[in-house]
Amino acid sequence: IFLNALTTPIAQELLNKKIVMDILAMKTRDGELGLFAAMENNHPLCVTRFLSKINGIAFKYKLSKANIMDLLKGATAHGTPVLYIAMSKGNEDVVLSYISTLNIFAKKYSFSQRQLFTLLAAKNHDNMSAVHIAIHHNHYKTVKTYYAAINVISQSLSFSADELKTYL
C-alpha cells in the first residue's frame, strides 16, 4: 500500500527523486532492506510485488540505472546482496521470482551484460558468489532452480549460461 502511494499524482508533486530513493532504500536497525527480509524469509509474492513497484516508481521518478541497480542488489551494510542471502538459505521460490523479474529490468533499462552478471553472481564482501554459498550449504535444488531461471532469461537477453558461469 505504501509503495502504491508513491505512484499517486499528489506524491509525484510532493516528492523528488532523492526522497523516493531514501524511502525505497530504508533499512532496519540491522542494515537490511525490506527486499532482503522477503528474500531471506522466502516470500516470493512480496519479492515480485516489491520489484514490480520499483519498476513503476523508477519510471515515474526517472531513477538512474545506478539507482535501480542498487535497489535490485539490495545489499546490507556489510555488502551482502539479496540474492546471496536467498541462495544461502535455500529459498528457491524467491530465487526464481527475483531472477524472472531481473529479466524485465534488464530489458527495460538496457542493462549491460556486466551489470546483469553482477546482480546474478551476487557476490558477498569476500567475493563468494551466491551459487558457491548455496553449494556450500548443500542447497542443490536451489542451484538447479537458479540455473533453470538463468537458462530462461539467457534466451531472451542473448547470453549463454556458460558466459555467466565464467563470471562466477
Predicted region positions:
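Ankyrin repeat domain, specifically the short helix-to-loop turn at the C-terminus of the second helix
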Residues: 3-23, 49-71, 97-119, 147-166
